């Protein structure tokens, strides 16, 4: 059966969720909580982009993605840096 899938995106920049690649307006200070919210609201999958610019930020983003994965039950796809 074919059906449409709801796949929200979280863009992580400096440990926070921002609006878009070129719009760094903060949507949430807690990306883990945001991922859980999307999961609980019925998303089919979660797409996460790491917009970090340094190795330190990248390592922090990876840690956040691991934490996100622990609190959601839907598949997560990640990309970026």
PLM features per residue range, with description:
Residues 1-72:
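Conserved N-terminal beta1-alpha1 strand-loop-helix module at the mouth
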Residues 74-81:
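Glycine-rich beta-to-alpha transition loops that act as phosphate-gripper elements at the mouths
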């Amino acid at each position: 059966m074919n059906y449409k899938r709801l796949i929200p995106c979280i863009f992580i920049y400096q440990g926070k969720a921002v609006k878009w690649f070129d719009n760094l307006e903060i949507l949430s200070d807690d990306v883990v909580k945001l991922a859980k919210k999307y999961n609980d609201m019925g998303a089919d999958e979660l797409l996460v982009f790491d917009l970090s610019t340094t190795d330190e930020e990248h390592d922090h983003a990876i840690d956040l993605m691991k934490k996100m994965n622990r609190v959601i039950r839907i598949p997560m796809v990640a990309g970026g840096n």
